[in-house]
Amino acid sequence: MVTVDEVRKAQRAQGPATIMAIGTATPPNCVDQSTYPDYYFRITNSEHMTDLKEKFKRMCDKSMIKKRYMYLTEEILKENPNVCAYMAPSLDTRQDMVVVEVPRLGKAATEAIKEWGQPKSKITHLVFCTTSGVDMPGADYRLTKLLGLRPSVKRLMMYQQGCFAGGTVLRLAKDLAENNKGARVLVVCSEITAVTFRGPSDTHLDSLVGQALFGDGAAAIIIGADPIPEIEKPMFELVSTAQTILPDSDGSIDGHLREAGLTFHLLKDVPGLISKNIQKSLTEAFKPLGISDWNSIFWIAHPGGPAILDQVEEKLGLKPEKLRATRHVLSEYGNMSSACVLFILDEMRKKSAEDGLETAGEGLEWGVLFGFGPGLTVETVVLHSVAAA
């Protein structure tokens, strides 16, 4: 008879979890950031608020965002004026949209599965993450049906985590892949701003910040350990993960589900809190590897906004090119909450291949991925870039 210890050993993978494929998707509706203030104040019937509109224009100008993608079109908003008001009861309307559209945007998974090159029947686990809406059965169930995954796929649904969750899903997928031999984990982050969109208020400027930054997008990755040679192509190994709540950060980023949808609250010192504490997270993550030069690693940081990136860059003395991929994704898509860091991974590996570099991590061996969000919570993931075949 076998022992429990022998069973446990047999269940575990030999190598580290690796990212084998990445896919992304956005709604077709693209909005230009330079013209967005005019559109936003017109569609919300707020053109009389001229001073506030000027403030919003400055926010959009400073956002470093060129364009964003949004499910909410002018037609949809005209049909649902309660979504355009500042705090009108509108949760039912919003829920009706996101319950359908969040899993549908998860079609990014189709791209990831295609790149992976294995039949979808080999997916053993699904981790689905969204801050857009809540439902039972969840978006994980709906996506399983949409993709035609096996009914026995082991699902984990994460709702209402916020912007740090791109790191959380990697942490969970790493544990699943390494502790279940042969596991292939499909991870999907799908975010739609239909839950947070609302008209302006001159008494709640933090809500306006969200209107200037957030965009819609979904990203999917396939994670597994012990890749099959010649069939699966590993890009990044997930070496270690950590999560922490920053000191003295209570209430710095909050979101509350109300009759008016998901409300967003932000303190001005968020960039300061992150930049003040980031060195500690880096030291704890990289000390075991003997790395202390933050310019010697590749960077994937959740782009909460340009001020966070600027202050992190300044605090750590990072060269401008270190946050190139991060700033590129912010510029092209805005802040897509949990999906952002996965978009940045995709951008980095594509540009690295384009430039003929030796690894998917800008030619470097080691890298870091940061998620920042409500709490204030920080997720840290140490990545090892696999040499290009």
UniProtKB/Swiss-Prot annotation:
PROSITE patterns in alphabetical order: CHALCONE_SYNTH
Entry EC number(s): 2.3.1.74
CDD domains for the chain: CHS_like (cd00831)
Signal peptide boundaries: none
Catalytic reaction list: (E)-4-coumaroyl-CoA + 3 malonyl-CoA + 3 H(+) = 2',4,4',6'-tetrahydroxychalcone + 3 CO2 + 4 CoA
Tree of life domain: Eukaryota
GO MF assignments: naringenin-chalcone synthase activity
Any one GO biological process: flavonoid biosynthetic process
Record's keyword annotation contains Cell membrane: no
InterPro entries referenced in this protein's UniProt entry, alphabetically: Chalcone/stilbene_synt_C, Chalcone/stilbene_synt_N, Chalcone/stilbene_synthase_AS, Polyketide_synthase_type-III, Thiolase-like
Keyword annotations: Acyltransferase, Flavonoid biosynthesis, Transferase
Pathway where it operates: Secondary metabolite biosynthesis; flavonoid biosynthesis
Name of a matching Pfam family: Chal_sti_synt_N
Active-site annotation: C163
Keyword flag Transferase: yes
Record family assignment: Belongs to the thiolase-like superfamily. Chalcone/stilbene synthases family.
Role description: The primary product of this enzyme is 4,2',4',6'-tetrahydroxychalcone (also termed naringenin-chalcone or chalcone) which can under specific conditions spontaneously isomerize into naringenin.
Protein name: Chalcone synthase 1
UniProt lineage: Eukaryota, Viridiplantae, Streptophyta, Embryophyta, Tracheophyta
